[in-house]
Each structure stands twice: as structure tokens, then as C-alpha cells.
Swiss-Prot record:
One of its GO terms (biological process) is 'de novo' IMP biosynthetic process. This is Formate-dependent phosphoribosylglycinamide formyltransferase. N(1)-(5-phospho-beta-D-ribosyl)glycinamide binds at E22, L23, E82, D293, K362, R369, R370. Homodimer. Gene3D superfamilies: 3.40.50.20, ATP-grasp fold, A domain, ATP-grasp fold, B domain. GO terms for cellular component: cytosol. Pathway: Purine metabolism; IMP biosynthesis via de novo pathway; N(2)-formyl-N(1)-(5-phospho-D-ribosyl)glycinamide from N(1)-(5-phospho-D-ribosyl)glycinamide (formate route): step 1/1. HAMAP family: PurT (MF_01643). Belongs to the PurK/PurT family.
């Protein structure tokens, strides 16, 4: 796109986001700053992104008929999936018919909607290094896979889930049945199927934000952000920092793996490529064809954060992945199960040097639901991490009243 219309006019450039959580909210804001008319879609009303979009729509996005009807009604120029639980088959059908352009592509949305599609692409089609794995449809198959191939310890994850839900570590035979039950409770849509992975002896894991954007000649170019280190607990991100130091050879291999995966998925936009690293060895873990939760740190570290990069790339605009300052992020959890919570300690959090916070505006809190994030920058990334954790600890969510 080189010409942009005026929002809420007959010539508006319209973008529809499928999924309107905290990441989608930031993408919507970035799009609006470029004069784009936005449509925020989610499965529940008053989702964070719906609070800032021009239009808010609530449907079951995994229902093909509902999804098709909404796209045909709104007639967006671009459809941007921000979550996995979407009727991707319908997106492929509409894209093939020329009804809409899907970001990055409908095929990429389908392959990355669950762990099976993308793992088979990476390991079997592209021959990239990954952990050993088996897909299982029952507790019996899971036990057989562990006994015959994977061994202990191992990790079990639902084929489809988000933010670490349903993921657990199996150390001993007695852990297998509880892990299966936990995966069934935490999975989305593809209930009854899991991936069991052998442990990779890695030193650290990173997210490599990889951006496919048009160059001056109109051809797609690949750009890399500085590697993002992150800490996960039970598969859920709790802290991230940028840059994470890496050996030159490991960084080069990371670029090669990320380029191979994103070239195959094709299209334009930001891809969050997760990798395990030990010394100069690198293993592919997962990829999301959209901004990544660990990439929220870029709100304080890059001249163009991951959401601005995504907005620019999908609109065909130039991007800049340069680092502005080292920095860190730390998650603010809900801490309570309640609707319409309030937050104490915000002023105290912002008194921590070089910090900022984002409160997501989710209408309902759960004990382990991400309700906000603290950000901090500093020339020393370890200082930034300390400040981000401190700021996050000072924000105290509670039930209202």
C-alpha cells in the first residue's frame, strides 16, 4: 500500500484484527497512528483492543460461518490474526477467492495455529534442529511415546494453547497421568491431542523478532531485532529483556533458522521465533506470525517497537529494527479472581527510575492472568531487569469495593 484513506470515510484503509488482547491493542494503536480504520474482533466484549478500535465486534472466531459473515460484512483490506483459535480453513478459502488478504498469509495462520503444523514444517520439511517429539491422542499413547522414544524428563503441551496453558514437566512415571489431565484442561479447540518433547540441554532461550517488510525495490527483505531473553514459569512468560548476549556463531545460526522458517511461511509482518541455545548450538522451538508477548519489552528498547514494526510491515512501509536502549519487562499478574479490579501502587511503581507501565484493561482478572506489564530501560540490562521487577511488584491489583 502506498496510498492511505481517511478513517470512517468511503476511502478508508481498513484492517481487521482477529483477537484483541494486550498485543492486539498495541497493534491497533500503531495502525491508528498511520491513519488506518480498525476493527477489533474477540470472543468476549470489551477486550483490550476493542476499547481503542474504531469498531468492536464479538464473535466465535473458530466458527467458519461467523467469521465469513463478519469479513464479508466489514470488507477489510487486511485481516490480521492475533491469536491461534481461528477458523483458518475459512481464511484460506476467502484468501483464495480474492475476498481478503490475510497477514502474513492464510497458510501461515493455519500452520502456526497449533504446535503440530509448525513443528512438522520445521523438523520434517525444513530439517531444522528441534527437540525430539511425538504427537499423542490418548494417555496410553503418551505413556508409550515416553517409554519407547522420549524418556524422562520431558515436557507435555496441548497441541493448541496459549501463554503456557496446559504445559507441564514430567520427571517420573507418576507424573504422566496428571500431565495429561492438565493438558486437556488447558488446551484450546484441539482437545485430546498433545505433543511430548524430550528435554533439550540448553543454556538459555530467546525470542528473535523477525520482520519481513518491503524494501525500496518492492521486494520482501528480512530484518532482525536484537535477541530477547526471557524467563518462563510453567511455559508462561514472566520477564523479558533485550538484548540478550549471544556468541556470534549462535546469533548467525539463529538468523539462519528464523529466515528459513519465515521465508517458508512468507508474507509480511513480524514473526516471533523462539529458540533454545547452548554455546554455538541452536534449536528451533516455536514461531508466532505476529508480535510476541516477550516482545513487549520493545516498547522501551527500540525506536520502532514490535507493534509499530508489524503495522508498518503489513502496510508495505519501511521498518527500522534498531535498538534505542537496553531494557526489560516484568509481568503484572491479576492476583485475584474478580471482574473490574482496581490497581493500587501505580504511582510508587512509576517512581522507580526509568520505568513505565501498561495496564491492559482486561475486564476480568484471574490469579495468573496477565493484567499489565512493567517496563524499564538502562544502559545495563541487569539494572533494567531489577527495576522492571521492582516496578511490577509495587502494582497491587485487588477486587473493587
Amino acid at each position: 500500500m502506498t496510498t492511505f484513506g481517511t478513517p470512517l470515510s468511503p476511502h478508508a484503509t481498513k484492517v481487521m484484527l482477529l483477537g484483541s488482547g494486550e498485543l492486539g491493542k498495541e497493534v491497533l494503536i500503531a495502525l491508528q497512528r498511520l491513519g488506518v480504520e480498525t476493527i477489533a474482533v474477540d470472543r468476549y466484549e470489551n477486550a483490550p483492543g476493542q476499547q481503542v478500535a474504531h469498531h468492536a465486534r464479538t464473535i466465535t472466531m473458530s466458527d467458519p460461518a461467523q467469521l465469513k459473515a463478519l469479513i464479508e460484512q466489514e470488507k477489510p483490506d487486511l485481516v490480521v490474526p492475533e491469536i491461534e483459535a481461528i477458523a483458518t480453513g475459512m481464511l484460506e478459502e476467502l484468501e483464495a477467492a480474492g475476498t481478503v488478504r490475510v497477514i502474513p498469509t492464510a497458510r501461515a495462520a493455519r500452520l502456526t495455529m497449533d504446535r503440530e503444523g509448525i513443528r512438522r514444517l520445521a523438523a520434517e520439511t525444513l530439517a531444522l534442529p528441534t527437540s525430539p517429539y511425538v504427537f499423542c491422542d490418548s494417555l496410553e499413547e503418551l505413556q508409550t511415546a515416553i517409554d519407547s522414544k522420549i524418556g524422562y524428563p520431558c515436557v507435555v503441551k496441548p497441541v493448541m494453547s496459549s501463554s503456557g496453558k496446559g504445559q507441564s514437566k514430567i520427571a517420573l512415571p507418576k507424573d504422566v497421568a496428571p500431565a495429561w489431565d492438565h493438558a486437556m484442561a488447558g488446551g484450546r479447540v484441539s482437545r485430546g491431542r498433545v505433543i511430548v518433547e524430550g528435554f533439550v540441554d540448553f543454556e538459555y532461550e530467546i525470542t528473535l523478532l523477525t520482520v519481513r517488510a518491503l524494501g525500496a525495490d518492492g521486494q520482501v527483505e528480512t530484518h532482525f531485532c536484537e535477541p530477547i531473553g526471557h524467563l518462563q514459569v510453567s511455559g508462561d512468560y514472566v520477564e523479558s529483556w533485550q538484548p540478550h548476549p549471544m556468541r556470534p556463531a549462535a546469533l548467525e545460526k539463529s538468523h539462519e533458522i528464523a529466515r528459513a522458517v519465515t521465508d517458508n511461511l512468507s508474507g509480511q509482518g513480524v514473526f516471533g521465533v523462539e529458540l533454545f541455545v547452548k554455546g554455538d548450538e541452536v534449536w528451533f522451538s516455536e514461531v508466532s506470525p505476529r508480535p510476541h508477548d516477550t516482545g513487549m519489552v520493545t516498547l522501551c528498547t527500540q525506536w520502532q517497537n514490535e507493534f509499530e514494526l508489524h503495522a508498518r510491515a503489513i502496510l508495505g512501509l519501511p521498518v527500522d529494527t534498531a535498538l534505542k536502549s537496553p531494557g526489560a519487562s516484568a509481568v503484572i499478574y491479576g492476583g485475584v479472581d474478580a471482574a473490574g479490579i482496581v490497581f493500587d501502587g501505580v504511582a510508587d511503581a512509576l517512581r522507580v527510575p526509568n520505568t513505565d507501565i501498561r495496564l491492559f484493561g482486561k475486564p476480568e482478572s484471574f490469579v495468573k492472568r496477565r493484567m499489565g506489564v512493567a517496563l524499564a530501560f538502562d544502559a545495563d540490562v541487569d539494572v533494567a531487569r531489577t527495576h522492571a521487577r521492582l516496578a511490577a511488584s509495587k502494582v497491587r491489583p485487588r477486587a473493587a469495593g
